[in-house]
Structure formats: structure tokens, C-alpha cells
Regions:
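N-terminal intrinsically disordered, cationic/polar leader segments
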Residues: 2-114
């Protein structure tokens, strides 16, 4: 759905599914001995602690209907377009950006999209 047509309920549902997907991916990786990334969720904020001490923060921004990502490589803002989070600057999809940032910080290929 276009960003302009998103209701508060739609935003909260999509944001919750997105954070839950990230957490489920981290749990799957831990169980499969892929990588141990600790996560801590406080409301709409999810903090990932990667090996080596670096962090990635994913934060919901309900008033703006955005999802923000802060990583070593920079800060990114995402808006939902047709049900997919897209970077407001270059249009990159959220999970693709998260995967590239996490891979760079972890020193190994990680894919959050599946």
C-alpha cells in the first residue's frame, strides 16, 4: 500500500512483523551456529549487539510511519511502499540494507531477507 494510504494500525502491524522477523532470524542463526548476535527489544526499539562490540539499532517512528536503522555505515529512514520498507533516499529495501550493514559489521555474509 502506498505510504500516504497507511493507517496507524497498518503501520504498527507492519513494524511489529518486521521486528519479529529480525528476532526470529537471529534466533535461527543462534540455533544453527551461524552467528551469535544478541538482541534487546524495548517497545519499538530493537538493539542488535554484534560480535566485536558493534551495534545496530532499529527503531520505529510511529508519528512519521517510518522505521529507522542506525549502523556503523550510517543512519537510514524507511517508509512502507506497497507493504515493503524502502529507504527514503535511495529506495533500497529494508532487509537488503540491514543484511549489508550487519554483514559489514560482523565480517561475514548475513541475509535477513529469508
Amino acid at each position: 500500500m502506498p505510504a500516504s494510504a497507511m493507517t496507524d494500525a497498518d503501520y504498527h502491524a507492519l513494524a511489529a512483523r518486521t521486528l519479529a522477523h529480525v528476532e526470529a532470524t537471529l534466533d535461527r542463526w543462534l540455533e544453527s551456529d551461524v552467528i551469535d548476535i544478541d538482541s534487546q527489544r524495548t517497545g519499538g526499539l530493537l538493539e542488535l549487539s554484534l560480535p566485536g562490540g558493534s551495534k545496530i539499532v532499529i527503531n520505529t517512528q510511529p508519528p512519521l510511519h517510518e522505521l529507522w536503522l542506525a549502523a556503523r555505515g550510517g543512519g537510514y529512514h524507511f517508509k512502507a511502499i506497497d507493504g515493503t520498507w524502502r529507504d527514503t533516499r535511495d529506495g533500497e529495501e529494508f532487509f537488503a540494507r540491514l543484511s549489508s550493514e550487519a554483514s559489514a559489521q560482523a565480517g561475514k555474509a548475513l541475509d535477513f531477507s529469508s
